[in-house]
Amino acid sequence: MDIAQLLAADGVVLRSGASSKRQALHTVADTAARALGLNENRVLESLLEREALGSTGLGSGVAVPHARVEGLERVVAVFVRLDTPVAYDAVDDRPVDLILSLIHI
């Protein structure tokens, strides 16, 4: 499967002013909610629950937060590029500026 097939319509943010991990995840949730007609708080809560299990910061400035939103049956991706890297508890302790989020809907 091509990643372009996973990207939600309007699921790309090339310039986010988020200045913290939580704000970055809020941007992901907002983008997914608007693109897919979902409740933003529901998406954000799912992302935060998953992050509480362990950081999804892969290193080299990349994070792959993911979540399952109950009742939905496909996987969609949201891409966010931050203007300024943020602390993310990544495995290499480097800040993150590229976020590819997978939402199972």
Model regions and ranges:
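Cytosolic covalent-transfer regions centered on His/Cys nucleophiles
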Residues: 1-103
